[in-house]
Amino acid sequence: MRLKSFSTTLDTLRRRFNDSSSEEDKLEKNIQDETSIKEVSLQDAKQSDEKGVEEKVFNDESFSIDVAPKPEDELSGIVKARYLTEHSSRISFYICYFSIFLLFFAISFQAECYYSLTAYATSAFAGHSLLSTIAVANNIISAAIKPPLARLSDVFGRLEAFLFSLLLYLVGLILMAASTNVQTYAGGSVLYNAGYTGVELIMTIFMADTSSMANRSLVLGISYLPFVVTIWIGPRVAQEFYMHSTWRWGIAVWTILIPACSIPFLAVYSYYQFRAWREGALKGTLTINPVELFKKLDIIGLILMTAGLALVLLSISLASYDTGKWSDAKFIVMIIIGGLCLIAFVLYEIFVASFPALPFRLMREPTIGACCAMSFLFYITFYCWDNYYYSFLQVVHYTSITAAGYISYTYSFTSCATGFFLGILIRLTKRYKWYFVASIPVYILGQGLMIRYRGEQYNWGYQIMPQIIVGIGGGVIANLLTVAVQTVVSTENFAIVTALVSTVTPIGGAVGSAISGAIWNSVMPKRLEKNLPSDLKDQAYTIFESLTVQLSYTRGTDARNAIILSYSEVQKILTSVATGFAGAMIFPVWFVANPRLSTVKTHIFDSKESKV
C-alpha cells in the first residue's frame, strides 16, 4: 500500500472535515445533536411524565421530528429494514422472533458441543496446546468481520448479510468435521467463528431495528434465554457423541439443524423484501459502485488490523512454547512487522480512511469510549483463564465431559439469567448506569475466588461458586455494553456503533487468548518437567500436548498428581492476571451516561410504533 505524504494527508483531512457527505462526520454530528436534544428531552420529561419525547437526527444540516429521510438519501439495506417494520404484521414479527429464539437455541447448543469436544479434537492431532492459538485466530477474524458485515447489512440488506454469515458458519463446521490435521481444524474453526459472529451480529441489529430503547435490554435478555436451557443438555450430548460415536459427528450434525431453525426468519424477511421490490420501495435508493463500496468496507484498514493482530498475537502465543524462539529472527521480524501494521492501521483510520472500520473519533464521546474500554478489558479478563479451564476441570477435579461442561457453563447460565432480570429492572426503573457500576466489584470478586479455590482439595462447589459470581457481574456488563452505546446515537447509526463495540470485544479476546497461550506454553512444560516422576520426564511433551494422555493416568498415581500440581500452578498465574485486568474496569465505567430511557426514542421507523 502506498502511504500518502503528510501534506496530502492534511488536505484529505480538510476535505473530510468540510465534506457533508462524510458518513463519520454525520455520525459525530448526530451524537452532538442528540446530546443536546436529550438534555431538552429530560427537561420536558420532568414537566410531563405522560409525554414521550421522540428524537430523530437525519443529517448534519437540520433537525425535524416531522420530516422523514428521503429514500434516495438512504442505503438499500436501511430502506428494506424500514419497509419490514412499517408493513409487516405483528404475527410476522412474532414468527421472526420465534425463529431467532430457535436459532439462538441451536447455535448455543452447537457452541457447547464444540467447546466440550474441541480439546479432544486438538488432542487427536497432538495439538492441545494450540487451544489458545486457535482462540487468538478466532477472535481476530471476529474483530475483522464485524465492521464490513455491519456496513454490508446497510448497503445490501440484513437478509443478505445473514445468508453470507450462515454460509461461512456451515463451511466452517464441515471443514472441522472432515479435518485430517490440526491446521484444517483450525481453519474450519476460524470460518465457523466468523459465521457465528456474523449471525449473532445481524440478529442483534435486527432486534435493534424492531425494538424500543426501553425494551432493548429485555429483548436481548429474552434472546439469550436458550443458553440457560442448552447449558444443561449440551455437555451431556457432547459426551454421548464422544463415548458412542466420534467428536466429528458432534460437529457435523449442526450443519442440518442450524439452517432448519433459520427457515421461518428467512421466509418472512424474504417475503417482505420481495414486496418492497415489487412495490417500488427500493427505487431511488443510494447505489454504490465497487470503488465506493471498497472504501465503505475499509478493506485496507481491515487488512492492516488483521495482519497486525495476527503477526503480533499469534507470534507471542506460538513463540512462548520454546523460549529459544524469542531469539529467532523469524519471530522477531513477525512481531516488528505486526507492530508496524498496527501503527499504520491507527494512522490510516484517523487520517486517511473515508469510512473507518474503527472510527476512533467517535470514542471521544464518553459513553462510547468508556464502553469500548470496558469491552476490551472484559474480554481480556475472560479469555485469560477460559481457554484451558475445561481441561483444568477434567484433570484436576476428575470431572466427566458432562460435569466439566456444567461447571464451565455455570458462568453462561448465570450471565443469561442475570441479563433477563436486568432487562426487567431497567424496564421498571428506566436507568442502567448504577447497575453497571455495581457489577464491576462483583465481577472482580468472582475472579479473585478463582485464584483461591483452584486446588484439588476443593470440591466442585468451590468451582461453581466463583462462576456464579463472575456470571452475575459479567451478565450485567455484557448486556449493558450494547444498550449504553445505543442510547447516544440514532437508529441509523445503531449498526456502526454496535459493530464498533463488537469489534473491540474480540480484539480483547485475542489479547487475552495470546496472554493465556504465552503463559501456558512457556510455564506448563517447565512445570511438568519439574513435577513429573523421573521415569516420565522424557514424556513431558506428549503429556503436554494431549488431554487424552493426561486423563489416562489414574487418580492417586504420582504421574497424575504431578500433572494436577502443574495445572494448579499455571491456573494461579492465569487467574491472577485476569483479576488484574478486571480491576482496571473500575475506571471507565464512571464515564458512561445515565439517561432516562423512557425519554430516549432513537427509532427511525416512527411511522408506526416499534413492534417490540
From Swiss-Prot:
PROSITE patterns: MFS (PS50850). This is Siderophore iron transporter 1. Pfam families: TRI12. The lineage of its organism: Eukaryota, Fungi, Dikarya, Ascomycota, Taphrinomycotina. GO terms for biological process: siderophore-dependent iron import into cell; transmembrane transport. It is found in: Membrane. It comes from the Eukaryota. The modification Phosphoserine is found at S5, S21, S22, S36, S41. It comes from Schizosaccharomyces pombe (strain 972 / ATCC 24843). Belongs to the major facilitator superfamily. One of its GO terms (molecular function) is siderophore-iron transmembrane transporter activity. Keywords: Ion transport, Iron, Iron transport, Membrane, Phosphoprotein, Transmembrane, Transmembrane helix, Transport. The chain crosses the membrane at residues 91-111, 125-145, 159-179, 188-208, 218-238, 249-269, 299-319, 331-351, 365-385, 406-426, 434-453, 464-484, 495-515, 573-593. It is a multi-pass membrane protein. One of its GO terms (cellular component) is plasma membrane. The keyword Acyltransferase does not apply. Involved in the transport of siderophore iron and so has a role in iron homeostasis.
